[in-house]
């Protein structure tokens, strides 16, 4: 199910006709934002910061994951769209991590992310916090 959710996200974000429409109407594109230093166009995403619990009787060990997912544009309604998008994005997040009997992954923090075309401009984040764990 998680693999299918991730593949569905990729299909949506890479749909050429959808991207053409969004480009025409908003001047921006849907994107899976690279976690590297360069993004070549204005884009919006969701960064999922996570960690792991190595054993149930152990303290939580925080390991940072940065898995961004693209959204088409950022405006006053972006928060609502972020929340609509989160369910699928979180499923895809867990699809990347192997869940064993003694290891459980969690999402510690969720942040909308705006990346501008100007390399001098860093990303802005708006605090949207969520803790999601699988036990």
Question: What is each model feature region?
Answer:
Residues 1-57, 96-100:
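Small/polar-rich, solvent-exposed N-terminal microdomains that initiate assembly or binding
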Residues 59-61, 72-94:
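Extracellular/virion structural assembly segments
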Residues 105-117:
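Low-complexity, intrinsically disordered Gly/Pro/Thr-rich segments
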């Amino acid at each position: 199910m998680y693999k299918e959710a991730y593949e569905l996200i990729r299909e949506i974000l890479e749909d050429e006709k959808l991207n053409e429409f969004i480009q025409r109407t908003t001047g921006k594109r849907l994107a899976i934002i690279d976690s590297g230093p360069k993004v070549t166009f204005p884009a919006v995403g969701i960064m999922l910061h996570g960690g792991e619990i190595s054993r149930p009787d152990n303290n939580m060990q925080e390991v940072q994951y940065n898995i961004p997912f693209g959204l088409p544009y950022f405006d006053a309604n972006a928060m609502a769209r972020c929340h609509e998008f989160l369910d699928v994005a979180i499923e895809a997040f867990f699809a990347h991590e192997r869940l064993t009997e003694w290891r459980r992954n969690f999402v510690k923090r969720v942040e909308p992310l705006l990346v501008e075309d100007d390399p001098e401009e860093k990303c802005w984040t708006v605090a949207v916090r969520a803790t999601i764990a699988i036990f």
